[in-house]
Curated annotation (Swiss-Prot):
Family, as annotated: Belongs to the EF-Ts family.
Region feature (Involved in Mg(2+) ion dislocation from EF-Tu): 80-83
Name by which UniProt lists this protein: Elongation factor Ts
Source organism (scientific name): Allorhizobium ampelinum (strain ATCC BAA-846 / DSM 112012 / S4)
Primary location group: cytoplasm
Length: 308
């Protein structure tokens, strides 16, 4: 039997927002499995699906570069925000973003590409910057989107400089119409993606494993009602329809005009663009997403020093 430690309970509390005893029981019921325990708490109505740890804390910058039909978004991490605000670091992130345009957009290909400012590879240039600045840094993630005919619209939320910030979005729009009008609606949709973080463009593109996990949680929640299985099945189907509406971009209420869905807003924009519009891809990078920064307990450190 898996031992349930205080650290495990603490982690589950941070991830779920549930109380200590509920977390302890959830872990015991699920053999210490963290994700299964979160689902168990959700099924009991104790935790919310979108509750996050709140400890996402890597520093650095998101950088975006675009050539119209191709755009790339990169994440370069540093240890402190002080370095992220440094002009040299910002220039490097901007340079890496521009280099990434001529690669296939993967981290490996970008690291291997030549960084114009140094004549060395991006990877070696980052190592040189580490030696100069005295702080560890790394190219962590990158995504590139392309269209043959259309635009890849970009948006950086709360930009600290042109193309640099903490959150970057790309939206690829395929259309033979007016590119200026296309970019206008594309940027608005990129702002929408920044705000809502959709899981996919269309409902059928939502990851099957994610959808199945939601379905299982909804089944358990519905069974708590004590209703017959045929009623539960209808309840689950209704909740799944609502889930897909909430997480698929095209069915979401458009943040700029909530009276329209994103799909309806696109249809309206086609009047100005002069041709049909199809969203072929989206990318959204939030700085530090998925990284936990180690928190130091100052009181514990002092106590440890005092004990020798």
């Amino acid at each position: 039997m898996t031992e349930i430690t205080a650290a495990m309970v603490k982690e589950l509390r941070e991830k779920s927002g549930a109380g200590m005893m509920d977390c302890k029981k959830a872990l015991a019921e699920n053999g210490g499995d963290m994700e299964a325990s979160i689902d168990w708490l959700r099924a009991k109505g104790i935790a919310k699906a979108d509750k996050k740890s709140g400890r996402t804390a890597a520093e650095g910058l998101i950088g975006i570069a675009s050539s119209g039909t191709t755009a790339v978004v990169v994440e370069v991490n540093s240890e402190t925000d002080f370095v992220a605000r440094n002009d040299a670091f910002q220039d490097m992130v901007r340079g890496i973003s521009n280099v990434a345009l001529s690669t296939d957009g993967t981290v490996d290909s970008i690291n291997a590409a030549t960084y114009a400012a140094t004549g060395k590879s991006v990877s070696d240039s980052i190592k040189d910057a580490i030696a100069t600045i005295g702080e560890n840094m790394a190219l962590r993630r990158a995504t590139q989107l392309k269209v043959e005919d259309g635009v890849v619209a970009t948006y950086v939320h709360n930009a600290v400089a042109d193309g640099l910030g903490k959150l970057g979005v790309l939206v690829a729009l395929k259309s033979t119409g007016n590119k200026e009008a296309l970019n206008t609606i594309g940027r608005q949709i990129a702002m929408h993606v920044a705000a809502t973080n959709p899981l996919a463009v269309r409902a059928e593109e939502v990851d099957a494993a994610v959808a199945e996990r939601e379905r299982n949680v909804f089944i358990e929640q519905s069974r708590e009602s004590g209703k017959p299985e045929n009623i539960i099945e209808k309840m689950v189907e209704g909740r799944m329809r609502k889930f897909f509406e909430d997480v698929a971009l095209l069915s979401q209420a458009f943040v700029i005009n909530p009276d329209l869905t994103v799909a309806a807003a696109l249809k309206e924009a086609e009047k100005d663009v002069g041709a049909p519009i199809e969203i072929t891809g989206i990318a959204r990078l939030l700085l530090g997403e998925g990284i936990e920064k180690e928190e130091s307990d100052f009181a514990a450190e002092v106590a440890a020093v005092a004990k020798g």
